[in-house]
């Protein structure tokens, strides 16, 4: 029996406020919704009232920030999930946002351990230093 995924805002200490979640993923069209745990996490999060965003690792970028401003950004796609495993999501917009703008950033990209993957972990580590809440610690993924 599959374990039910729960994304309770109280688990994050946010007193019932919905979360703005960013999933750093492989290209969305390459995800197999019927077996991909990331898709299951996105569906569960949305079911519990949270906002779901996705970004490819290649869209993570560094901008030289002004003092006190974030420097790590991504091209984030706002998604709504669907129960259909072939047409499992709908993009409802995209914008360039700092990673710090999200309540949680979840690194869900599968290796290969190539330069894009390593660069993504460096940028995620930098975003963490800027105050972003990054889950799946970048250094642990890389080292």
Label every PLM stretch briefly.
Residues 4-9:
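Intrinsically disordered, low-complexity segments enriched in serine/proline and basic residues
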Residues 13-15:
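Short, positively charged and aromatic/hydrophobic N-terminal segments
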Residues 17-18, 29-143:
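Conserved N-proximal alpha/beta basic substrate-recognition cap immediately N-terminal to
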């Amino acid at each position: 029996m599959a374990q039910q995924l729960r994304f309770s805002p109280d688990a994050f200490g946010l007193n019932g406020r919905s979360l703005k979640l960013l999933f750093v993923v492989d290209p969305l069209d390459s995800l197999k919704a019927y077996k991909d745990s990331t898709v299951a996490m996105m569906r569960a999060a949305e079911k519990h009232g949270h906002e779901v965003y996705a970004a490819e690792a290649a869209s993570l970028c560094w901008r030289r920030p002004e003092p006190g401003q974030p420097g790590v950004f991504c091209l984030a796609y706002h998604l709504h999930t669907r129960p259909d495993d072939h047409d499992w999501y709908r993009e409802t917009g995209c914008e360039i946002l700092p990673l710090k703008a999200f309540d949680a950033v979840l690194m869900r990209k599968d290796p290969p351990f190539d330069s894009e993957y390593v660069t993504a972990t460096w940028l995620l580590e930098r975003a963490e230093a800027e105050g972003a809440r990054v889950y799946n610690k970048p250094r642990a993924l890389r080292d």
